[in-house]
Amino acid sequence: TVTERPLCHGIQSIQSKRGSSSHNHNPFVALKAHGTTEENGEVYGINLIYSGNFSIEAEVDCLNATRLLAGINPTDFTWRLEPNESFTAPEAVMVYTDKGLGEMSRIFHRTYMKHLIKSPWRDVERPVLINSWEAAYFDFDDDKLVAFAHEAAKMGVDMLVMDDGWFGHRESDDSSLGDWYVNEKKLKGGLSSLIERVNAEGLKFGIWYEPEMISPDSDLYRAHPDWCLHVPNRENSPARLQYVLDMTRKDV
């Protein structure tokens, strides 16, 4: 959903302080002239190439001049620079067009496709994949997945992605994140056997995992409770029954 508001004196902002950007708080704004549509009118777009805490502010001063400030969110952010060290701030991509919001979007799209995306799939057609999640949730084993792959192959699907539930003792969403070893009760022959069987059906094999998260009920958390993001001397705050690993630690 596109949210529009008129500029006014003072500061308006969008920001994220949750450690991520994504669809919740997209690090993007567009300033458009009055009357601009999808096909016509002036528009300036700015997008931060950054997935962490960010802030984008639009300020209109007493002379009706507009200043746009975009970058790392300053809340709780510090960075110590030793002599001769450097710091690289997030890059921003800025677009101007007088052909409306649609052309702005297309310019962003072409720019990212040509200059930002490094995937080998950039210029080729992506495979069609089917994911096990909505079909089985946590209730599957290797035979059920192979049968799933067999039916998917009939529809021209190119890849089966095995989703959540294949690791640790994961039978629901409240355990085992961080224990990235195969649940052999479900995958009796292990990963290699399952992959070979899915490949034999003519499908590639993909696997889901969430390496940045850790469940309180996991071997990893029991061994290293200090590895999750936390504030010393305060009770940890779970979200979705899980914690976030502190990826700034080399041991993590």
Question: What are the residue ranges of the model-derived segments?
Answer:
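Histidine (H) residue identity feature
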Residues: H9, H23-H25, H34, H109, ...
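Aromatic-lined carbohydrate-binding/catalytic grooves of carbohydrate-active enzymes
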Residues: W121-V252
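Long, charged amphipathic helices and adjacent flexible linkers at domain junctions
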Residues: F108-V128
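N-terminal accessory beta-strand-rich subdomains and adjacent acidic, glycine-rich linkers
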Residues: T1-Y112
